[in-house]
Amino acid sequence: RICPRILMECKADSDCLAQCICEESGFCG
C-alpha cells in the first residue's frame, strides 16, 4: 500500500491520506 510519510492524527482510516490506516497510536501509518 502507498502511504505518504506525513505525521497525521486520526480517529478513523478515512482521516488518513492515500492507503494509510489509522494506527492504535492515534496517528496514520
Swiss-Prot record:
GO terms for molecular function: serine-type endopeptidase inhibitor activity. Keywords: Disulfide bond, Knottin, Protease inhibitor, Secreted, Serine protease inhibitor. The keyword Protease does not apply. The record marks R5, I6 as: Reactive bond. PROSITE patterns: SQUASH_INHIBITOR (PS00286). The keyword Phosphoprotein does not apply. Disulfide bonds join C3-C20, C10-C22, C16-C28. It is found in: Secreted. InterPro entries: Prot_inh_squash, Proteinase_amylase_inhib_sf. One of its GO terms (cellular component) is extracellular region. Strongly inhibits trypsin, weakly inhibits chymotrypsin. Belongs to the protease inhibitor I7 (squash-type serine protease inhibitor) family. The presence of a 'disulfide through disulfide knot' structurally defines this protein as a knottin. This is Trypsin inhibitor 3.
